[in-house]
Amino acid sequence: MIGEWNNGTGRRKSSVARVFLKKGTGKITVNGKDIQEFFGRETSIMIAKQPLVLTNNLEAFDVMVNVNGGGESGQAGATRHGITRALIDYDASLKPVLSQAGYVTRDAREVERKKVGLHSARRRKQFSKR
């Protein structure tokens, strides 16, 4: 399996995606389901497929993704990051193109923690003058 599969790990928010690429027909499975079935929203599917579309490899690879943690948006972003890393593992000459589009860089934004004495991370209690 290691010889023919290229892999990459992607992260976004609290989601982690392990991606495996193999030369094939363009079938994408996420956690054992088809990508259309797993991601309900069309925008999430588009986000996940962006690196393959950019490099014109949408029909060239079979992609198998294991993703856990976070929500739909984070999982789609993690899948995109993982596919990008797997493509670079397959062909390093794709890195400048993917980097120019901003897919190689890990989006480091995380949820800010809730502080004591506040409603949420920054929301204060309502001030009453009287």
Curated annotation (Swiss-Prot):
**InterPro entries referenced in this protein's UniProt entry, alphabetically:** Ribosomal_Su5_D2-typ_SF (IPR020568), Ribosomal_uS9 (IPR000754), Ribosomal_uS9_bac/plastid (IPR023035), Ribosomal_uS9_CS (IPR020574), Ribsml_uS5_D2-typ_fold_subgr (IPR014721)
Q: Does the keyword Ribonucleoprotein apply?
A: yes
Give an example GO molecular function.
Answer: structural constituent of ribosome
Task: Note the SUPFAM superfamilies from the entry.
Answer: Ribosomal protein S5 domain 2-like
Q: Record's superkingdom?
A: Bacteria
Tell me which PROSITE patterns the record gives: RIBOSOMAL_S9
Q: Which GO terms describe its biological process?
A: translation
Q: Please give an example of a GO cellular component term from this record.
A: cytosolic small ribosomal subunit
Pfam families from the UniProt entry: Ribosomal_S9
**Alphabetical UniProt keywords:** Ribonucleoprotein, Ribosomal protein
Which NCBIfam families would you find in this protein's record? PRK00132.1
The record's PANTHER family line, in alphabetical order, gives: RIBOSOMAL PROTEIN S9 (PTHR21569), SMALL RIBOSOMAL SUBUNIT PROTEIN US9M (PTHR21569:SF1)
- Homology family: Belongs to the universal ribosomal protein uS9 family.
Protein name in the entry: Small ribosomal subunit protein uS9
What species was this sequence derived from? Variovorax paradoxus (strain S110)
Species classification:
Bacteria, Pseudomonadati, Pseudomonadota, Betaproteobacteria, Burkholderiales
